[in-house]
């Protein structure tokens, strides 16, 4: 009887130990995540959100934009204030009067990679008016710029990267957005390789033993010069120069000056909202490369061309 009692006691003890072990493991597993949430709190959630947004980006989706007001086309074209007619000399000894008779159409001009899309975003936030483009970028069309390919006076400004008489013809005035060529060329290379907010992989710079990148820099530096000088010097309408660095440093002041140039009365409430949401999703985040993609010869060529163009535009304090 005594032996049998000890056996029953042993079995009961084993069962108790087994059940106790299960309960202990369950308690630990439940406590683990709770402690992690308690220690990290919002940070842990933020990391999850970052991963989720990044994954959506890989799938070609962007987080939804929040506009300060509903976007719309201009109800009526903005017209140039009545001014005395200008005397234009069509050939030696012959003058004609030029009247301001047509609605304004403003071009938003830049070399690619200079922040054109970001400035369009800021203008749409600050006015609620759609901006147009001579292009039809389906990515932009679906994510905040429904007036892609609209190039008439129903929009606030029209994006273009073109230059020359045919490109100037439709416009009465132009906003010329200028960015340092070294950064603009790099941004354009990233755009062609990774989209509006993506990046080129390091191996892209080494493609064809670097010859592709070398030729890209040479071609784009020439295009950067032509875009900026042709509009600044040869376009016959009014031109407002906007340097990208000034826009970054003083978003409010730059937006105010642009709206004044466009003869558009500033809405203080919308402007304040635009400044709160100034980053948006169309500005490429900074990324530090582990190498300098520009060779010494490239740097020298860029420095020389930058100095020439900036001097022609009256900018002497850059770089």
From Swiss-Prot:
Gene3D superfamilies per UniProt: P-loop containing nucleotide triphosphate hydrolases (3.40.50.300)
Q: Where do transmembrane segments lie in this chain?
A: 8-28
* Family membership noted in the UniProt record: Belongs to the WSCD family.
Species per Swiss-Prot/TrEMBL record = Anopheles gambiae (African malaria mosquito)
Enumerate the GO terms in the molecular function aspect: sulfotransferase activity
Q: What is this protein called?
A: WSCD family member AGAP003962
- From which lineage does this chain's organism come? Eukaryota, Metazoa, Ecdysozoa, Arthropoda, Hexapoda
What Pfam families does the record point to? Answer: Sulfotransfer_1
Give the domain of life.
Eukaryota
Q: Where found? A: Membrane
């Amino acid at each position: 009887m005594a032996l049998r009692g000890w056996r029953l006691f042993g079995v009961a003890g084993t069962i108790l130990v087994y059940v106790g072990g299960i309960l202990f493991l369950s308690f630990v597993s439940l406590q683990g995540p709770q402690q992690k949430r308690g220690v990290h709190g919002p940070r842990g959630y933020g990391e999850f959100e970052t991963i989720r947004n990044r994954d959506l980006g890989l799938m070609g989706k962007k987080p939804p934009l929040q506009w300060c007001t509903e976007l719309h086309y201009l109800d009526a074209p903005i017209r140039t204030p009545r001014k005395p007619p200008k005397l234009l000399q069509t050939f030696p000894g012959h003058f004609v009067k030029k009247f301001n008779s047509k609605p304004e159409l403003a071009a938003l001009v830049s070399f690619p990679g200079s922040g054109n899309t970001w400035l369009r975003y800021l203008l749409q936030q600050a006015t609620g008016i759609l901006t147009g483009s001579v292009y039809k970028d389906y990515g932009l069309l679906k994510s905040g710029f429904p007036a892609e390919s609209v190039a008439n006076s129903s929009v606030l400004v029209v994006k273009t990267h073109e230059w020359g008489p045919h490109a100037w013809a439709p416009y009465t005035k132009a906003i010329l957005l200028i960015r340092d060529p070294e950064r603009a060329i790099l941004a354009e290379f990233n755009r062609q390789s990774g989209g509006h907010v993506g990046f080129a992989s390091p191996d892209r710079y080494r493609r064809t033993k670097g010859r592709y990148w070398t030729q890209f820099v040479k071609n784009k530096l020439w295009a950067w010069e032509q875009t900026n000088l042709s509009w600044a010097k040869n376009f016959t309408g009014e031109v407002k120069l906007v340097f990208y660095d000034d826009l970054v440093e003083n978003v409010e002041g730059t937006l105010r000056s642009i709206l004044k140039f466009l003869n558009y009365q500033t809405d203080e409430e919308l402007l304040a909202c635009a400044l709160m949401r100034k980053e948006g999703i169309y500005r490429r985040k900074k990324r530090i490369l582990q190498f300098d993609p520009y060779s010494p010869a490239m740097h020298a060529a860029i420095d020389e061309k930058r100095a020439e163009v900036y001097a022609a535009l009256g900018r002497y304090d850059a770089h």
